[in-house]
Curated annotation (Swiss-Prot):
TRNA binds at residues 14, 64, 66, 112. Monomer. NCBIfam families: pth. It is found in: Cytoplasm. Its main location: cytoplasm. GO terms for molecular function: peptidyl-tRNA hydrolase activity; tRNA binding. The lineage of its organism: Bacteria, Bacillati, Bacillota, Bacilli, Lactobacillales. Pfam families: Pept_tRNA_hydro (PF01195). It catalyses: an N-acyl-L-alpha-aminoacyl-tRNA + H2O = an N-acyl-L-amino acid + a tRNA + H(+). Gene3D superfamilies: Peptidyl-tRNA hydrolase. Keywords: Cytoplasm, Hydrolase, RNA-binding, tRNA-binding. The record marks 91 as: Stabilizes the basic form of H active site to accept a proton. This is Peptidyl-tRNA hydrolase. It comes from Lacticaseibacillus paracasei (strain ATCC 334 / BCRC 17002 / CCUG 31169 / CIP 107868 / KCTC 3260 / NRRL B-441). Hydrolyzes ribosome-free peptidyl-tRNAs (with 1 or more amino acids incorporated), which drop off the ribosome during protein synthesis, or as a result of ribosome stalling.
């Protein structure tokens, strides 16, 4: 079993915002797999399929970002999903715009959605795919992450989403994580 969790905030108000990068990536992967993420369970919108004989979950928590851990924990418990079967997709202000970084484990690095997942699961031992949204120069962080990308930045973001979905597909198809890091970092 494998579960890919895209972090974001629910609702039209936040659609396309920088903080919803995880949602955008998971939506792109769902499109590739001909899935619709529309089943509501455990405070999350989910879709399931089978790939190479393995059950796959795509998840978009429907709590706000800072409470994402509850949905992740409840899905893990109900479906008996292990931490090493989880891949979380997140935005990262410390990375340049559109840059990908894959990590096997680690601290939240200031990301409240990741912090809540670590708190809810009791561990930081889960895979992450971070996509750079870069740090705001003069704008307040909360305003920065909740605004959409500029039209000039959008092509770079679209390319980053494609690469992120390539990485997730490779993982779903069994590529070892160390190879993923070498290929996409």
């Amino acid at each position: 079993m494998k579960m890919i969790v895209g972090l974001g905030n629910p609702g039209q108000k936040y659609a396309g915002s920088k903080h919803n990068m995880g949602f955008m990536v998971v939506d792109g992967l769902a499109k590739r797999l001909n899935l619709t993420i529309d089943k509501l369970e455990f405070d999350a919108a989910t879709a399931t399929t089978r790939l190479n004989g393995e059950k796959i979950f795509l998840v978009k928590p429907q709590t706000f970002m800072n409470a994402s851990g509850r949905a992740v924990r409840e899905l893990m418990m109900f479906y008996q999903i292990q931490l090493d079967e989880i891949f979380v997709v997140q935005d990262d202000m410390d990375l340049t715009l559109g840059k990908l970084r894959l990590r096997k484990r680690g601290s939240a690095g200031g990301h409240n959605g990741i912090k809540d997942i670590i708190s809810a699961t009791g561990s930081d031992e889960f895979c992450r795919l971070k996509i750079g949204i870069q740090h705001p120069k003069r704008q307040r962080v909360v305003d920065w992450v909740l605004t959409p990308f500029s039209k000039t930045d959008q092509p770079l973001i679209d390319d980053a989403i494609e690469k992120a979905d390539d990485a997730l597909e490779d993982w779903l198809n069994g590529m070892p994580f160390d190879q993923l890091m070498n290929k996409f970092n």
